[in-house]
Curated annotation (Swiss-Prot):
Protein name: Signal-induced proliferation-associated 1-like protein 3
All residue ranges annotated as the PDZ domain in the record: 960-1024
Extent of Polar residues compositional bias: 89-99, 112-129, 257-268, 1074-1104, 1151-1160, 1298-1316, 1409-1436, 1526-1541, 1566-1578
Function: Plays a critical role in epithelial cell morphogenesis, polarity, adhesion and cytoskeletal organization in the lens.
Domain of life: Eukaryota
Segments of this protein annotated with the region Disordered: 41-157, 240-325, 438-461, 1040-1104, 1117-1164, 1184-1632, 1678-1705
Amino acid composition bias (Low complexity), ranges on this chain: 54-69, 1190-1201, 1260-1275, 1589-1601
Gene name of the record: Sipa1l3
UniProt feature coiled coil, ranges: 1715-1769
Predominant location category: membrane
Pfam family, one: Rap_GAP
Modified residues (Phosphoserine): 94, 140, 394, 1358, 1538, 1541, 1614, 1617, 1672
Modification type Phosphothreonine: residues: 1381, 1694, 1698
Protein source organism: Mus musculus
Amino acid sequence: MTTYRPLPNDGVDLAASCGARSTDILPGPHPGDYTPMGFWAQNGSMPQPLGESPAATTTRPSPTTPAMPKMGVRARVADWPPKRDALREQSNPSPSQDTDGVKTTKVAHSMRNLQNGQLPSSTPASSGSRAFHRLSRRRSKDVEFQDGWPRSPGRAFLPLRHRSSSEITLSECDVEEPGDPRGTRHPGVLPLFREYGSTSSIDVQGVPEQSFFDILNEFRSEQPEARGSQNLRELLQVDPGALSGGSCGTKGDPRNGQPTKDSLQSLQPLKEKEKSRKKPVRGLGSGDTVDSSIFRKLRSSKPEGEVGRPLGETEESRSPPEASRPWVCQKSFAHFDVQSMLFDLNEAAANRVSVAQRRNTTTGASAASAASAMVTLTASRAHSLGTLDPAFTSTEDLNCKENLEQDLGDDNSNDLLLSCPHFRNEIGGERERNVSFSRASVGSPGGSSEAHMAEPTLSTHRTNASISVLEVPKEQQRTQSRPRQYSIEHVDLGARYYQDYFVGKEHANYFGVDEKLGPVAVSIKREKLEDHKDHGPQYQYRIIFRTRELITLRGSILEDATPTATKHGTGRGLPLKDALEYVIPELNIHCLRLALNTPKVTEQLLKLDEQGLCRKHKVGILYCKAGQSSEEEMYNNEEAGPAFEEFLDLLGDKVCLKGFTKYAAQLDVKTDSTGTHSLYTTYQDYEIMFHVSTLLPYTPNNRQQLLRKRHIGNDIVTIIFQEPGALPFTPKNIRSHFQHVFIIVRVHNPCTENVCYSMAVTRSKDAPPFGPPIPNGTTFRKSDVFRDFLLAKVINAENAAHKSDKFHTMATRTRQEYLKDLAENCVSNTPIDSSGKFNLISLTSKKKEKTKARAGAEQHSAGAIAWRVAAQDYAQGSEIDCILGISNEFVVLLDLRTKEVVFNCYCGDVIGWTPDSSTIKIFYGRGDHIFLQAAEGSVEDIRDIVQRLKVMTNGWETVDMTLRRNGLGQLGFHVKYDGTVAEVEDYGFAWQAGLRQGSRLVEICKVAVVTLSHDQMIDLLRTSVTVKVVIIPPFEDGTPRRGWPETYDMNASEPKTESETTTPGGRPPYRSNAPWQWSGPASHNSLPATKWTTPATPGHAQSLSRLPKQTPVVPFRESQPLHSKRPVSFPETPFAASPAGADRVPPYRQPSGSFSTPGSATYARYKPSPERYAAAPHPLLSFDPHFMHDGMSSGDSSSGGLTSQESTMERPKPEPLWHVPAQARLSAMTGSIGSKHPSRQDAAGKDSPNRHSKGEPQYSSHSSSNTLSSNASSSHSDDRWFDPLDPLEPEQDPFSKGGSSDSGIDTTLYTSSPSCMSLAKAPRPTKPHKPPGNIGLCGGGRESAGRPHPVDRRREVSPAPVVAGQNKGYRPKLYSSGSCTPPGLVGGSRDPPRQPSDMGSRAGYPTQVYKTASAETPRPSQLSQCSPFQLSTSVPKSFFSKQPAHNKHSTGWKRTDEPPPRPLPFTDSKKQVDTNAKNVFGQPRLRASLRDLRSPRKNYKSTIEDDLKKLIVMDNLGPEQERDTGQSPQKSLQRTLSDESLCSGRREPSFASPASLEPGLPSDVLFTSTCTFPSSTLPARRQHQHAHPPSGAPSTTPATGNGFPEKKSAISASELSLADGRDRPLRRLDPGMMPLPDTAAGLEWSSLVNAAKAYEVQRAVSLFSLNDPALSPEIPPAHSPVHSHLSLERGPQTPRATPTMSEESPLDLTGKVYQLEVMLKQLHTDLQKEKQDKVVLQSEVASLRQNNQRLQEESQAASEQLRKFAELFSREKKEL
């Protein structure tokens, strides 16, 4: 750029004042100088002495403006002819003026010198007031370039060619500026003028010549008290308000401050009215006013954009109401974009006078130089001077003047970047401003930014700064397919409104000059909309209203919403005048004239609207070597080093400039005068040309390297590339008015494979923050990710810089000239008359009163309807005035003071709201919210906002509930990790209160759920005396309300996981997104979990979320079938009773039905791919911690013997059915961790009878503990009520514990997780595959599936998980047959859409599966367990606990002795509970009366004995009972993990016997499937110990081996979980043995004995009846282990069949007979297994006895030896 240097005599005074400091006093321009002579002293060189003759300057070029190329913004400014012409008239100096200017120059120089090193007091007092004016004006271009100023274009200065071209443009603009009036007005003072471009590096910027107090002194003449400390303090106090509220900062106040005063003085008479109105505002009134305005100007360094009112608060307070009162647009007007919502007509009118005064104020690197002499420039100037102390430079003035309270920078530094005044640094961890609740809960803006920024913009969420257009066409709304890229921010995309909706279409343009607003332009268009069913044809008017302000009113208004005397909906339409008068009543309609219909008008309007849009950017790159930091050093690096070359190669392509046809950024593409090559690239349709310092021409004899600086110094954004060892960068070292943003990139390990880069950013303080945010403490590897990140940062940086004062002012002036040109030269004489061509009609219409607009018509507008509200800013703990906008796509909040978006979310993300009389809380996403208060006197706005939300979102009004606990302290529902209700206990207190499956908890006891982890959620529900919750009801189908981005993100991540984790057999690994696949009414519950892909912190939640997807996966089922045997057995019983019930359980009921089922249902669905589940957890990574804990806890329970599960879990990949296994694996792997939460699951299982504690660990476990039964107490109560009877029993209990884990609200992920943990802890897990099979079925089943190593086992396991999942998902009215469960899993996953919820549980336990289970004799116990599971659902916790105990005993313990009478149907929950009470926990934990303690449920009067008999006897009964239980008892009976958990909780890992492990699961399983119980009946307990369990084992044999597989089979689903526990050596309890409750159980011994007998006699029948659904013809005789496996496999293959079986539990006579035969065979096998187990146990007992005897002998021997030693020592002592 070219700089104007004063004539020789201009700097005379400077010599005297600055001579001491000057180092370069050459008469001619110094080779390295590009600044005016007058400023050499400041820049480090000295001006020529006073005595220097004019001859010295004769060699300089003439004062004419040099013809230098215009670049960048300056180039655009130069192209603004209208403004230039107007300004030129005023700026042409006269000779006399020149003379005055010379004199003035001397004074100015001296003043500068004073600023730079002399005391301010030395400044002449006469120049005080003028200096003050200059001060304020320095913020404006006009002031800075006054004629009196040495460098003023109007002065007789010789142009310096050394300046960058950037100044030329600015100089030209300045020349055009009205400098005369200022110069003339203040002839005695040097007129202020500012420099642009690299020249700005000079510290001498306009006013900076004086210190702040100097100015005050000078101003004393006008206001003696201006300098008073009190006044100053007051002014300062006001200023802050003005800064923060009045205007963005520098922009509004400075521009409107002092400059206004001067400008007002120079205003023409035409402006007297405006002047008088704003005198007080401008400080023209009293001296005080002047002071305030001055201070405002001085301190206001913020951009106008920050403040809605450029005048500033101070001015506003004194200004007329119209200036201070914000303009409110009609509510029926739908805004097209964000900036339209900020349109303020009063502000536009108030700023009319100041527009001309708001000259190009400096910002960015030059911000220090102009308005507040940025420290950056000051420091750089001082640096160049060397002798000057930066403290005495204009920087000091800036600090004092601009912000009396600031500006020292932000004290934010690191090894890349130092803090700098007037600059703001971003070194990592910063986040954009957001007023939502979660942002405050997360911590400081920098907190948790890393996670937030890991992929800053690579998500469906939009950053606040990227929100522009609010009215989005349907085809573009929430486009899931759109690529995820970093958001481009700070772009006014709404500027294309005219291009997209008006150009080429019929519309009308009107121009005119309003007396208040000045030139205005209106575009209006009428368009047809879809007809309304009730209101007929619909039309809307699209309107664009432009004023000189950059903010434009764009939007539309429905014809029906417009008051008019004309009929709506006609082809003719309304008079345009009516629409405009309604929308903009303040506009003088009569001044408008129709625009000429010429291409020029359209072209001009497009330029006017889109002047801020640019897709071409030029960016500078400076190379900083080790030990360097200064601008000069960087510019003088002649060649690029290898590290720099490597960086350039990554950043873009090196192109040859000669002949280059794309964007060249002012580089010479013809003669190579600017270098031969440059760096060019593109990103998201943006072209970027880099000005690389080493590629630009190098001048050896010019240290300033002007040929390089002329380009880089004029770039708004500059990248500083630092080699290792470079000194930290500071903008103080850069001298440029245009460089506003510096992006520092430092390379680490350059030119190696480990090369990486770290970043930091510093921006001018009046430039808003921009993204993508830099992760805290993160380095970027050399990759396209880093390249994209950096390019997005560069583009956003330039966009943000354009909002700074300088560019804002330039754009405003340009816009004003465009409008003026249109209003004067492009209009016709046709007015916009309401009558128009219908004069007669209009005359008559005038007499008519305008009809009111149709109420609520605007509610259906696509644009954003806006309301003024007060929003709670949780991050800052304050309330801010905002505009709420709700369009068809977004809900946004705009801060009126800063004029920025402070919140946005998709309408599809809104899930609910809580309205009050004058406030409203809007919930979105996972329960986060914003809190709004209606403006005073606008209470009706809340009603309108609610109505708008109903129209545009899928949310619903929240419901407050106070939940009661039952006798066991249970709440009666399960909660998933994301706060959605997995299941609700039928007829429980929660159910009675209106809680339904799919409901979403957003607040618990006044605590926002979004801030709670799953564990915390459960603990809060467990421990709160009074549980008050705020819930958002689900959709009609029971699906939870979820945010669209959440759903999309989860879906996207889940599929990824699935594909990534796909395991052999076509099943995705646990990570796989199986849950996504599942889709069905029932699965809706799980689906949400799936959506969330929450790591299922509560294993329960995870499985739910993933189960859905898994459910569809058939391969998982297939793998499950083997495991299905046991799982089938375990779920068979429950499902037999609950198949129909489960199916028919509505989505809402499903939750209740599946207290445990939700988890299991999910699991059932998800079980198809336990591995998927594991994979899913990855998508849910954010929740993994919880997932780990809860999952582990539930995993423990569910993986009950998951110690082996770990290994098995790996197997589970083949048998992905076990979602739990993923967690189970975790628990197994972590062991202690799993055990930690298992207790939780136990509680959970207890909580919800329906919860399949093991089968559905995810939901039941945590959920149960949390809500279902307040499982915390439940699980604890389980422990309390039931004490492990035997080690084996405790082992079973551990599985139950897994179910107990259920106590965690949704920890139920792994019902058997606790047991799994115990198992994991126990060495027995050695045979994980066996235990997994068993465990898997019963809630451990999932885990089992996850952990079973053998495919068969996996299949078994997966079925078990299915059972759990099904139970969980569908009120585990699991089919009685355990085999059904595994197939159900498989089937569930296929059928899942519906089954996932209720069928899920059922599907989880398909008839086939159950048959298989029953086929496996060992499963009977599991079936009984399943039966208990059902029981637990319908029965109180106590029942479940008892049942689980019973089942466990039956399965693992007493099974061997006698098949426990199948409580499978458990029609009478009480009976079942009683029977199981002791069995489950080995203690009379649950009493028949305990059921009463449970939440209210349908009561079944049958006694336990009757129930057992029914279960045993009924072929039909199994199914019937399933129905009964399914309706309520079954569901209630269906135990979630909570029941199982209870059992497991009691049992210890040491009880790892398959039976005991099984029992825990079986207890759950009992509720889920009867068949499982028969399997369980077999001594599955220590299968792991002995590799060959009874018949059950054979079926598992494929996976484990005959002995072990059989045991596994025998173990059944619950056994699977137990088996995992057993994976350590576990013993199978004789399924024939029925666990007996303790006397304290409250059971009648006679009833128990009868039940036991019935169980023994009818065990086969029970199994069959329970298995009926599962054993349906699809399941071939499951009697043989292999058959069981096969049937299980079939189950998975025919998921629906499985569910159908469970549904069809009642078979025809032939089918029943067949089932009975199969069951008999299975029973026979079970008996054989039991016998084998007995033999094994006997041998073990013998071995233990031998060991005991040996140990005793050794102990005695040791004692004897010790005695002898003692005697020996005593003797020696005596002798001594």
